[in-house]
């Protein structure tokens, strides 16, 4: 087997999966992925921030943290950026560089792989460690039984 140059280099796009702030990076990438699936490719920092703030885990999350997280993900190649100059009316606004962000194609494929791994079914007879976590999450969701009808015997 001939080992190509790119196989010996680290894959920076997968870095967000196993670093200090992965608890913030993974939801951001998942948000972009879900929007990507709905054909909404570009997002502003404010959109990302507001979506994350809807989750109780992100109640203490700040706009500065969001900006730093997006910058880190962009530096690893997960997000593509473009400066948005459509709404700029002053030189000061132009200098503040408001960006739009898009998930890179590599990040799309990494996130698809992550989702497949998260949804793996039990193949063997042993209890999968993530099964308990998935059960806990599923049991935490409210269940509606209004659509069920009882048998009349």
Question: Predicted segments — roles?
Answer:
Residues 107-145:
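Leucine-rich, amphipathic alpha-helical/linker segments
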Residues 3-39:
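Short alpha-helical segments that sit at the start of domains
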Residues 60-75:
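Short amphipathic alpha-helical interaction segments
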Residues 146-153:
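Conserved small/polar residues in nucleotide/adenosyl-binding loops
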Residues 74-85:
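A short, conserved structural fragment
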Residues 84-96:
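Short, Lys/Arg-rich nucleic-acid/phosphate-binding segment
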Residues 39-52:
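Short acidic, hydrophobic short linear motifs in intrinsically disordered regions
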